[in-house]
Amino acid sequence: MDQFTDREVTAAVEEAARRRKYVAAHCHPPSSIARAAMLGVRTIEHATLIDESSAAAVKSAGAYVVPTTVIVRALLDDAKAGRLPSWMSAKLAEVSDQSLKGLEIMDRSGLKLGFGTDLLGHLHTHQTREFVIRREVQSAAAILRSATAVNAEILMEPHLGKIQPGCCADILIVDGDPLEDIGVLAQDGRSLSAIMKAGEFVKFSP
């Protein structure tokens, strides 16, 4: 984000709006987060070092944050297993702690949080772990809203993310109650007894 001038970011935001799209920006420090929000960026990705002031800027602008807490934990596991240089382990541990503090600030500030992971390659196996990491700070209901209704809002797709007349009937039927234990969604699909896509079952396990 910081390598772009205000005029460049504004031009990207305006051009995206003309195409009915939006701009997302990878931001870590508070100054970048606040600047992106004030310039019209719709989603702030990561926001690892967010503070109260930058959170207020995001809220005032009506922007969203996608915390991606799992990427740091997954990389930390890799470092501890010797798959990354040893010097990275301490740094990742520090960033992991900070990401949870940031999530607390976001939650307390009432920001609209999307759900994403930023995982690539072999780290894809950690995708659903985001649910249980965010449980350390957020309620199950808030996490579910992030993964459904808020993500649909971010994408400007009003027919997604909700179960109501006029919406796409894209529904997961879970063996368990995610409001009681969000961990049922972190089992790599093993807890899914049925999957419905546009009103048609594509998986059904009676």
What name fits each language-model region?
Residues 18, 84-87, 95-178, 194:
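His/Asp/Glu-enriched, well-ordered alpha-helical/loop segment
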Residues 178-184:
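Short, Lys/Arg- and Gly-enriched loop/turn segments at beta-strand edges
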Residues 184-193:
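Short, compositionally biased
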Residues 28-30, 49, 68-72, 118-122:
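Active-site beta-loop-alpha junctions enriched in small/polar residues
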Residues 198-199:
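Glycine-centered positions in the ABC transporter ATPase nucleotide-binding domain
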